[in-house]
Curated annotation (Swiss-Prot):
GO cellular component labels: cytosol
GO biological process entries: lipopolysaccharide biosynthetic process
Gene encoding the protein: kdsB
Known catalytic reactions: 8-amino-3,8-dideoxy-alpha-D-manno-octulosonate + CTP = CMP-8-amino-3,8-dideoxy-alpha-D-manno-oct-2-ulosonate + diphosphate
Protein name: 8-amino-3,8-dideoxy-manno-octulosonate cytidylyltransferase
Subcellular location(s) of the protein: Cytoplasm
Membership in a protein family: Belongs to the KdsB family.
Pfam families the UniProt entry points to: CTP_transf_3
Keywords from the UniProt entry: Cytoplasm, Lipopolysaccharide biosynthesis, Nucleotidyltransferase, Transferase
Protein purpose: Activates KDO8N (a required 8-carbon sugar) for incorporation into bacterial lipopolysaccharide in the Shewanella genus.
Primary localisation category: cytoplasm
Biological pathway: Bacterial outer membrane biogenesis; lipopolysaccharide biosynthesis
Species for this entry: Shewanella baltica (strain OS155 / ATCC BAA-1091)
Length: 245
């Protein structure tokens, strides 16, 4: 199975401009993401998908590969779709979408989503990762997306609110979403052509579009958390984690 991992990266983040190039222990964040991903088994190729020449130069500077995408891409999925069209992938090729703000992603977590497609061929069109929340401060933080899934690990819903709500108890597991997706090239193209979903627009969560249009999302539960960098403070958290790794 041909497996291409793409790391979408844009320079103009509203909360943290230039985020992909923010230094973490002397290396740009995008390099940490790329190098972590390269440790995962089963990948055919890795590319950073960007529309910014500064990011392109940084990636090529450490020996990484880049595919330049249109600056008109309205979403991360549009950027991924643009990249796979340029790369000429086949319909049944597997695409891993690793968010470029996860410099501490564990390589085995990437392997988990790949193995879902290997073990359950044809049963679903999209897969992603979850992690049981340990830090209670994340429960009501809208930057940490929560998720619920059925007994077969198919996603039921994703929300910025705490889900599920325990009416009579606070002692129950809550899972958050980790920003890794896997899907076939054929599905990415079909997904990108779908109109914006109502729930997707409310929560500002692209994965809800798949659920709204009746597509299955298989969930793998990772044993490893992954810090998502949204603010400069998150950079310091990453450096603290790396100091003890």
């Amino acid at each position: 199975m041909n497996v291409t991992l793409l790391i979408p990266a844009r320079y103009g983040s509203s909360r943290f401009p230039g985020k992909p190039l923010a230094p973490i222990n002397g290396k740009p964040m995008i390099q940490h993401v790329y190098e972590r991903a390269s440790l995962a088994k089963g990948l055919t190729n890795i590319y950073v998908a960007t529309d910014d020449d500064r990011i392109k130069a940084a990636v090529e500077g450490f020996g990484g590969k880049v595919v330049m995408t249109s600056p008109e891409a309205a979403s991360g999925t549009d950027r991924i779709n643009d990249a796979i069209n340029q790369l000429g992938l086949k319909d049944d090729d597997l695409v891993i979408n690793l968010q470029g703000d996860q410099p501490l992603i564990d390589p085995t977590s990437i392997e988990q989503v790949i193995s879902l497609f290997e073990r359950h061929p044809g049963e679903f069109e999209m897969a992603t990762l979850g992690f049981e929340i340990v830090n209670k401060a994340e429960l009501d933080d809208p930057m940490h997306v929560k998720m619920v899934f059925d007994n077969n690990n198919y996603a039921l819903y994703f929300s910025r609110s705490r889900i599920p709500f325990g009416r009579d108890t606070q002692d129950y597991p809550v899972y958050k979403h980790l920003g890794v997706y896997a899907y076939t090239r054929k599905f990415v193209q079909a997904f990108a052509a779908l109109p914006l979903g109502r729930l997707e627009d409310l929560e500002k969560l692209e994965q809800l579009r798949a659920l709204e249009y009746g597509h299955k999302i298989k969930i793998a539960i990772s044993a490893f958390d992954s810090i998502e960098v949204d603010t400069p403070e998150d950079i310091r958290k990453c450096e603290q984690r790396l100091a003890v790794d």
